Amino acid sequence: MTKTDPAPMAPPPRGEEEEEEEEDEPVPEAPSPTQERRQKPVVHPSAPAPLPKDYAFTFFDPNDPACQEILFDPQTTIPELFAIVRQWVPQVQHKIDVIGNEILRRGCHVNDRDGLTDMTLLHYACKAGAHGVGDPAAAVRLSQQLLALGADVTLRSRWTNMNALHYAAYFDVPDLVRVLLKGARPRVVNSTCSDFNHGSALHIAASSLCLGAAKCLLEHGANPALRNRKGQVPAEVVPDPMDMSLDKAEAALVAKELRTLLEEAVPLSCALPKVTLPNYDNVPGNLMLSALGLRLGDRVLLDGQKTGTLRFCGTTEFASGQWVGVELDEPEGKNDGSVGGVRYFICPPKQGLFASVSKISKAVDAPPSSVTSTPRTPRMDFSRVTGKGRREHKGKKKTPSSPSLGSLQQRDRAKAEVGDQVLVAGQKQGIVRFYGKTDFAPGYWYGIELDQPTGKHDGSVFGVRYFTCPPRHGVFAPASRIQRIGGSTDSPGDSVGAKKVHQVTMTQPKRTFTTVRTPKDIASENSISRLLFCCWFPWMLRAEMQS
């Protein structure tokens, strides 16, 4: 029977694989902490998170005395407590067991759902085990309490079509995987999720490089030979180390270990071919260099950005394939020529960097009166390797780089230059004043001077100045959030009339939004956006209600 969702925005229809659930009853308007627990689950309408009067922060802090007064107040409703749980901040997620217990005390059924995200308390508990933001111990305590009360492990969120085990695998919480599978039916461990190409929890762990969760799933009988909708086994969805950026040596090491683990777990009787990822382990390093017209000791350009001296070429212990080791001119590297206790070459600390062979080209010093242009050199075809985004150092204008494979791909992907007029998040118009790495967040960021005072700063963040603009005219955004709307300009243009939408961008491991879209658009896209929607939309909704 189809469930009627009383929430303002109903989630999309359930997938074919979702288990049948009991029909929900209408939500009581004012549940009491002393009320007896209902016999059937309901869907609670969305509500804003309560905050103390004149509170200095925009999020709820259960450690604050004023917030504790609200948390333990019998008049605080279940929808309001669900709104608190949705806040993706450590202060809230570390207290998931305390908040969850308060929800249960108010007569909440163990399988009740949050009307905004269609998630149950067990879903939230599994999400709260995420390392860095959540607390696995608190998440396990609440999960054990919910399971003892009869929580259904097979229930799925209709936004993501994920059950509790999928969330635990996605956020790499092995302790929760063990708790969930302890008394679950055998088919739960191999239950699939349509948002991950109908892959199992093991597929989800493999694609997210969750080594701990993958090991735990295999220990509990997960099928390593199960194929998803694309015909891939879990080992085949592990990200390829050759596609990773220059400074992802640790992630490459995890990918190699995880892929080996999953390959070896495939039964010998199963006629499955080994995973066919690009592998150049048997190609001598000198042949690779000869194909590039290089030799050890040559000056090289790394990804069209960093210059250094080629010190190593060959196979490594941290990832499959051929890698080059470069001693950089500046201390912008990651090591001293050794990774994981294995030394490949010697250089000063922070000046060693490893990269795939396709990301280097021979560097040629330019004549004083001409523009640098590196001659073309023979290159091997690495069709699966893509170059990193461009980088511009603070305080310096970037000179034209050599037409290497990486730099050509950078130009194709480039969105805007310094001085270009852009549209930020589809709403705010401004001029690019900065592009490069920052101290406040990893990756490459655009610094934009907005036409209107709707920004956050004057070009400086945490005492570090990246560009100069009037107060509240500065804002930073990743490349995915901007759109070039004109050529280079020195003065701001007229602002484009657009409806103002208050937005808070929340960060989770390995996941970002691309543009501002309606909830319907977000729900219809890939699993990453739909999963993060559960955390992001409540913040935007709360900002709208306050305005």
Swiss-Prot record:
SMART domains: ANK, CAP_GLY
ANK repeat copies, ranges: 117-155, 160-189, 197-226
Keywords: ANK repeat, Cell membrane, Cytoplasm, Golgi apparatus, Lipoprotein, Membrane, Palmitate, Phosphoprotein, Repeat
GO molecular function: ganglioside binding; microtubule binding; microtubule plus-end binding
Maturation and modification: Palmitoylation by ZDHHC17 regulates association with the plasma membrane.
Highest taxon in the source lineage: Eukaryota
Polar residues: compositionally biased ranges: 400-409
Subcellular location(s) of the protein: Cell membrane; Cytoplasm; Golgi apparatus, Golgi stack
The protein's name in its UniProt record: CAP-Gly domain-containing linker protein 3
Species classification: Eukaryota, Metazoa, Chordata, Craniata, Vertebrata
